[in-house]
Amino acid sequence: MFCNNLLLIIVNMKYSWVVYILCCSDGKLYTGVTNNIEKRVNAHNAGEASKFTRARLPVKILAASRFMTKEDAYRLEYRIKKLPRNKKLQVLKVE
């Protein structure tokens, strides 16, 4: 049930907002939005970003996708968060 090491990143620097999915140490998934993915993942691993990940350290980036607007990023985050785990993994093509 733990996440494998697959990392999918679509990078284009003109896009400033990132929707990311983290794999926690217990195999649970966490989805979020940021404008600085490196800083945000470091904050998660320092226990400073969310209560959910603080109890499940360390975390790894499983997937990330960049967007031009904050609104588009939050729309995708909302859609992903509504999905059950198996659907998230299907969307990401992760086992």
Q: Which residues does each PLM region occupy?
A:
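GIY-YIG nuclease catalytic motif and its immediate N-terminal context
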Residues: M1-E48, R54-R66, E71-K81, N86, ...
